[in-house]
């Protein structure tokens, strides 16, 4: 799947052939258990081990500002987004938007059913590698049409397992053939007030060292759930 991004003000194209969603990637055992508990509260079974790497169709990645979902039981979550292409690594921003009702039945299936919104801007990973864990992640939600934004998630990449471990564990650098790209969503932070649906989702990845920010927001259009 061909997708264009913005790198240092210039457009760069990737042919995405392989997409992975890493789950249960919290570095702190208590943080992992917190995420397990908040998902258990909505019926999701605990993982068999941590972390886990879920394959999804590459066509699920989208830069649109609106996604369509079935029913009212979906929600987004901010995640670092990695692109590996021809031996070069890039960092971006994504939301692992997930059907929580389906997740209670199968996490793997729930990862496949919703599009994964990603920001258009990316950075070269080697530009941030020496301060990667200082990079800040925040998301906000608007639960109903017309509502103000409410802070939903907040933390740094240091809350997630080292990205180098996730890269190695997933085989990211070697998973796509020459000339193609592999991408990975790298895990999330706990939600303030618990996991819940919203009408709009906004997220930001801020580099306090180089003074720059990647942002993206999208609306969620709920399609009727017909039985």
Label each PLM-derived region with a short phrase:
Residues 180-184:
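Loop/turn positions that initiate beta-strands
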Residues 185-189:
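Glycine-rich anion-binding loop/nest that anchors nucleotide
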Residues 1-179, 190-227:
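Catalytic-core "active-site belt" of small-molecule-metabolizing enzymes
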